[in-house]
């Protein structure tokens, strides 16, 4: 039976020998074999090869990536707003030959999303979190008021009686994060004495909420389809939102300065201004600066006209609120003060949630279209403004890390993952050159490496590694900071030795001036940087002048040299440069010297003798009359990023520095 089948199969096969070499015998000796055996040998060659070729499903890299993109697309489509996937949007973008989204299309998508579907899942999730707490209005009131008293005691040193905790920390954080966002009406409805003013205030707050929601919606729908290629129009919009965020955080610090001063005056508390006024510019000037010179306006292209109008609406509402809180009277007694406090905390938590929403949206994807990715100066300024606010007012608010935030806002993160995967699949499994530069700017794949400094032979060969890590409220906002501080001529992390290390958890008595200790200059504080060194205390670093003399960082020119040695020379991002004169010459960095979020400047570098830290951003463009001279805000302190421990302070009059006691 088998031989008959083999002979018939072989006869049909002979007619096709010329078309497939695999049917021919590969061994001349096979001709002497019996017919069934000889035919089976030729058949087996074809059967096995075709079976392997047609039946094997081991995925190739391209197939695996394609399958992953398909699965990710299905999941993403179920989470994102239907308007983002609409036929209208896709048809318009397909007809374009660039990676920009016309603003008319952005506005159209915003209008079509009538019920705010872009945030529906997000709002439902945080509403469930609040519902699980089962807190009444009185419970929410207590959380806001108690949190403020703790914050005031921490920031001013005033003797404020703080009641014991009635709510656990998790519930308290949930309230401070989300309660003001989902509230249909304010908890404190009468913060001012006049009923008319209270009504006006509630109306302005409602306008503010609508403007904040419009900015968030605009940002959601302004994204192009390809994050791995540049988008000039989107870059301007991202910069406008980042500048708007930095301006908003500056206003919030000014607002808290006013509220804190009025509370202390109403209750006749001893107001110890430990850190000085935290906002250096009054709201009129601060907001006017953005409205006139913001990125959307200064670009002059009109590609972000609607966005500029939307951010202007929000800032205008803040300006109107400033007038009320600065001039209108509060209700009498402790109850009146408490009502004002709760209203203030509601406003601050609402704004902080809004601005951290915008920043987190940048960090999970929108920064791809910034100028140099995360090295965009406007994005860095927004991060610095948030960090500055959290440093001074971190006790009053709560901040979600980006990793926690994407659990709530899953759709945007998945959308960017899908878009990047599709682009990599289209480019043969490799990211574009532009996207590779974005990743380099994020430092996720190009960490900073510093060459270890050799220790003198008289000292042990064991490495001496010191890190100063901030686990403070600022850390919850932008990640922990590993600070390496150069004091005198040696590296140290001794917090108690001097005030050169930022320490937000320091007790109040440690912030008071110490007349018996001279403050050592703080020289270098760099984010996300670890310095692995071998060093001996009081031993000079091997960084000296050409004549062999050691470098003293308290002198401006010496400090500048050490700073350059530490951070590396300014260079093009595509090249690596080494300074042959330095023992720290093996430095790989993707940013210029000015691209660091945190940087402290010694007093002598700017011509001051007082050991004060200057906030360069706040003093930018300072002129006579810029310093707020209202009774609520003392002009005797300059704004700073860290607590100042010194007997004297510096103020500014007509751009002329003066020291006083």
Swiss-Prot record:
GO cellular component terms attached to this protein's record: host cell cytoplasm; host cell membrane; membrane; viral tegument
Q: Give the location in the cell.
A: Virion tegument; Host cytoplasm; Host membrane
Protein keywords? Host cytoplasm, Host membrane, Host-virus interaction, Membrane, Modulation of host cell apoptosis by virus, Transcription, Transcription regulation, Transmembrane, Transmembrane helix, Virion, Virion tegument
Transmembrane feature ranges: 299-319, 339-359
Topological category with respect to the lipid bilayer: Multi-pass membrane protein
Q: Which domain of life is it from?
A: Viruses
Matches recorded under InterPro entries: Herpes_UL46 (IPR005051)
Describe PTMs of this protein: Phosphorylated by host LCK. The phosphorylation seems to be lymphocyte-specific.
**Gene Ontology terms describing biological process:** regulation of DNA-templated transcription; symbiont-mediated perturbation of host apoptosis
Stretches with biased composition (Basic and acidic residues):
10-19
Q: List the disulfide bonds.
A: none
Q: One matching Pfam family, short form? A: Herpes_UL46
Q: Where is this region: Disordered?
A: 1-31
Family, as annotated: Belongs to the herpesviridae HHV-1 VP11/12 protein family.
Function, please? Plays a role in the activation of the host PI3K/AKT pathway to promote cell survival. Interacts with and activates PI3KR1 in order to phosphorylate host AKT on its activating residues. Activates the host AP-1 pathway by triggering phosphorylation of host ERK1/2. Participates in host BIM and BAD phosphorylation, leading to apoptosis inhibition.
- Could you tell me what this protein is called? Tegument protein UL46 homolog
Organism in which the protein naturally occurs: Varicella-zoster virus (strain Oka vaccine) (HHV-3)
Q: Highest lineage ranks of the organism?
A: Viruses, Duplodnaviria, Heunggongvirae, Peploviricota, Herviviricetes
């Amino acid at each position: 039976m088998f031989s008959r089948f083999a002979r018939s199969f072989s006869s049909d096969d002979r007619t096709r020998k010329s078309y497939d070499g695999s049917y021919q015998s590969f061994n001349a000796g096979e001709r002497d074999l019996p017919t069934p055996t000889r035919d089976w040998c030729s058949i087996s060659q074809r059967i096995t090869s075709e079976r392997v070729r047609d039946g094997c499903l081991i995925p190739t890299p391209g197939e695996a990536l394609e399958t992953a993109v398909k699965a990710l697309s299905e999941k993403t489509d179920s989470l994102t707003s239907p308007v983002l996937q609409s036929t209208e949007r896709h048809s318009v973008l397909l007809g374009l030959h660039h990676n920009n989204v016309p603003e008319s299309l952005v506005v159209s998508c915003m209008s079509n999303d009538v019920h705010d579907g872009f945030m529906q899942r997000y709002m439902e999730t945080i509403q469930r979190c609040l519902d699980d707490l089962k807190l009444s209005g009185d419970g929410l009131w207590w959380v806001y008021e108690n949190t403020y008293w703790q914050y005031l005691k921490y920031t001013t040193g005033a003797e404020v009686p703080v009641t014991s905790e009635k709510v656990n920390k998790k519930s308290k954080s949930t309230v401070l994060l989300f309660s003001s966002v989902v509230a249909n009406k304010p908890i404190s409805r009468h913060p001012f004495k006049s009923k008319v003013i209270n009504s006006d205030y509630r109306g302005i707050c409602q306008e503010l909420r609508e403007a904040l929601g419009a900015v968030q919606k605009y940002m959601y729908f302004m994204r192009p389809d390809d994050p791995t290629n540049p988008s000039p129009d989107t870059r301007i919009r991202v910069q406008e939102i980042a500048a708007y965020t930095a301006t908003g955080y500056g206003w919030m610090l000014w607002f808290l300065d006013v509220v804190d001063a009025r509370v202390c005056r109403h209750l006749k508390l001893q107001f110890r201004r430990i850190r000085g006024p935290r906002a250096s510019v009054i709201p009129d000037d601060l907001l006017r600066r953005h409205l006139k010179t913001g990125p959307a306006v200064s670009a002059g292209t009109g590609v972000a006209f609607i966005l500029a109008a939307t951010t202007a609406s929000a800032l205008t509402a803040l300006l109107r609120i400033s007038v009320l809180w600065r001039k209108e009277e509060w209700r009498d007694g402790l109850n009146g003060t408490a009502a004002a406090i709760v209203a203030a905390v509601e406003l601050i938590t609402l704004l902080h949630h809004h601005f951290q929403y915008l920043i987190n949206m940048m960090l999970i994807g929108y920064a791809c279209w910034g100028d140099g990715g995360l090295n965009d100066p406007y994005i860095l300024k927004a991060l610095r403004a948030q960090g500055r606010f959290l440093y001074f007012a971190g006790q009053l608010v709560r901040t979600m890390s980006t990793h926690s935030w994407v659990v709530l806002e899953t759709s945007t993160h998945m959308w960017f993952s899908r878009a990047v995967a599709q682009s990599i699949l289209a480019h043969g499994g490799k990211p574009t050159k532009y996207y590779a530069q974005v990743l380099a700017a994020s430092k996720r794949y190009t960490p900073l490496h510093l060459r270890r400094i050799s220790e003198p032979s008289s000292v042990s060969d064991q490495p001496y590694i010191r890190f100063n890590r901030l686990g403070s409220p600022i850390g919850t906002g932008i990640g922990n900071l590993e600070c390496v501080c150069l004091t005198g001529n040696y590296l140290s992390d001794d917090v108690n030795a001097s005030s050169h290390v930022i320490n937000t958890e320091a007790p109040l008595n440690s912030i008071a001036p110490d007349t018996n200790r001279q403050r050592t200059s703080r020289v270098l504080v760099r984010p996300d940087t670890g310095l692995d060194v071998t060093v001996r205390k009081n031993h000079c670093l091997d960084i000296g002048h050409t004549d062999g003399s050691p470098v003293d960082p308290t002198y401006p020119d010496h400090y500048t040299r050490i700073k350059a040695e530490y951070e590396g020379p300014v260079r093009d991002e595509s090249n690596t440069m080494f300074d042959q004169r330095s023992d720290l010459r093996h430095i790989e960095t993707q940013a210029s010297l000015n691209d660091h979020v945190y940087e402290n400047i010694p007093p002598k570098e700017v011509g001051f003798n007082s050991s004060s830290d200057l906030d360069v951003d706040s003093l930018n463009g300072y002129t006579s009359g810029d310093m707020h001279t209202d009774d609520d805000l003392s002009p005797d302190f300059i704004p700073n990023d860290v607590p100042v421990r010194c007997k004297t302070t510096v103020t500014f009059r007509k751009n002329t520095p003066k020291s006083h006691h």
